[in-house]
Amino acid sequence: MSLLNFQIRGEGQPLVLIHGLFGSLDNLGMVAKPMAEDYQVISIDVCNHGSSFHRNDMNYPTLAQDVISVLDHLNVKQADFLGHSMGGKIAMQIALSFSHYVKSLIVADIAPIAYPAHHQEIINGLQQVELQIVNQQITSRKQADELLSHYVETPSVRQFLLRNLTTTDGQLHFKCHLQNIANCYPQIMQALDPNQSFSGDTLFIKGGASNYITAEHSEVIKPMFPNSRAKIIAGAGHWLHAEKTVAFNKIVKDFLNR
């Protein structure tokens, strides 16, 4: 069986970090680095992302099993888990399906609910960039950014997305498997099973300016994660760990050291 790509920093109690859609293990580097002073930080590339294997299936029970396979490979019996966005859903699914592996759970700006499709322009833009790279109409990151700007207005979002571009033997290509992600997108937006629950310590961290977690979601969250609490980072959007890194890391450390 294929194993996800992972990176280990530091020593101590294991802490597993799981990135969001179109990301890679590097995206949580600003969390991994300081946490590695006190923890064995295991950063994961989700399938179809980063340097991990490609598969045309991204349902959450399977994505959770992928991470558990890494822990089994490393002989890690229990860990703290932190996931952002899609990675938060994967971390929640691990807690729901494999609770004995989970010492505690930290979920960054996502709820276990179904979300409406809202990445279509991003997917379309990235696929157009990929097509023009294949046709050798795009040969530089600058050209890729210019084309993507017709689909994605915000420069920082484009910069994040284009971190997926890499060069091998002088040829640009995407590390993430765009077609699989596009095919599996409905699965990624799905809710987790509301009939499952995890009674362990759980922290939800919400960006104050983000609408990914709302007050109404507590009606779904509480029965599934009865021992959960929430922290809000004022002024932070969905990318709360990147926008307010010091505040985010303090909340994480305080929770882990409780």
Spell out what each predicted region is.
Residues 62-79:
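Conserved acidic catalytic loop of the alpha/beta-hydrolase fold
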Residues 7-53:
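Conserved HGGG/HGGXW glycine-rich cap/lid loop of the alpha/beta-hydrolase fold
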Residues 1-15, 36-39, 76-77, 225, ...:
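Alpha/beta-hydrolase fold catalytic core
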